[in-house]
Amino acid sequence: MTTQQTIKIQLVRSPIGTKESHRATVRGLGLRKLNSINELKDTPEVRGMINKISYLVKVL
């Protein structure tokens, strides 16, 4: 069994005033408040979501 790689992301900019789909993506990644951090599995789907809202998040 292989261990799944993870990726940590932090919400560094408020999604207020952004597109509704971008706000939904932030929520889909499990980020709520500013500076909240979440650790997710490193999959192509998660990478795509991070790429979509790259101006709102920071990869740690």
UniProtKB/Swiss-Prot annotation:
Cellular component aspect of the GO annotation: cytosolic large ribosomal subunit
Keyword Cytoplasm included in the entry's annotation: no
Keywords carried by this UniProt record: Ribonucleoprotein, Ribosomal protein
Gene3D superfamilies the UniProt entry points to: Ribosomal protein L30, ferredoxin-like fold domain
GO molecular function: structural constituent of ribosome
SUPFAM superfamilies documented for this protein: Ribosomal protein L30p/L7e
Domain of life: Bacteria
Entry keyword Ribonucleoprotein: yes
Self-association and partners: Part of the 50S ribosomal subunit.
Family according to the record: Belongs to the universal ribosomal protein uL30 family.
PANTHER family: LARGE RIBOSOMAL SUBUNIT PROTEIN UL30M, MITOCHONDRIAL RIBOSOMAL PROTEIN L30
Name the record gives this protein: Large ribosomal subunit protein uL30
Organism: Acidovorax sp. (strain JS42)
